[in-house]
Amino acid sequence: MFSNKFLSIIKSNLVRSFSESKCLLQESKSNLFKLRKTTGYALNKCKEALEKNHGNVDEATKWLNEQAQKEGWDKAEKVKNRQTKQGTLVLYADRANNQATIVELNCETDFVARNEKFLDLSSNLAKSVLVNSNVSESRVLLGREDLIKLQYLNESKTIGDQVALSIGNLGENMSIRRAVIYKLKEDQILGWYMHGSSADSLNNCHFGKYGSLVNFNMSQRNENYKPFDLGRQLAQHIVGMKPLSLGEMPKELPTTTSETIKIDDNETRLLYQEFLMKPNTRVLDFLNENHVLINDFVRLECGEVVESEETK
């Protein structure tokens, strides 16, 4: 017969063991849901990650990210020949530093192009391009091969890595096609417009199918227009009227407002087009009235065929 003292010891050990097991189970469950919440990966994947890493959340997170990246690249390789005719333009402007970018990200379907995860990716790509592209010129156009090598945000991976990861998550082929970057001097003014962008932007970015950036100077203060509003109107005109070039200022401007000026509806030079915001007035006359000089502009359309692609 066991003594009462011996039975008491066994009982105490069993209670302690049960209590410790319960605590471990609660901790394990807590870690599982914590990992699920912070990473967004499936519950079964999170459970596998914790089992492989002895319950260490940090190591499990690292393992999950590595697995997701590998699966993303594998998926990207499988779908790389699928056409990506849908997508979005995303505009990110940093007014404090007088710079902005428009990035085009393509996907297979309009359904994914409107997905919040896709738009979130687009906005982070635009921020990465503007912050991490080491450009010195006022205007630079980058293609896919240059873009995928850039650092993604402040993380230890590239834009190419992040796009591949998103391909794995969303299940469609994607491609960061091009980006235009404006980094202007202090005396220059930056204007921008994105057609179709909602008032509630995501991550301070604007999305749409048509976008424009314009670089201009004002020789004196304007009582009618604030620089930002003027830049927006000029960029909006560029999106709507599709100019192909700036054109040259004429040597002489009309001396009176009574002079009749013929405006060609098919004009492709920006300066000689009818200004969208002021009918029967050429852009150059509007600029002259408001002491404005346009230095440069760019207009992008999502999915448009560009010259370099036509020659392929």
Predicted features along the sequence, with ranges:
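N-terminal assembly/interaction segments in proteins that build large macromolecular machines
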Residues: 2, 19-312
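N-terminal chloroplast transit peptides
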Residues: 1-15
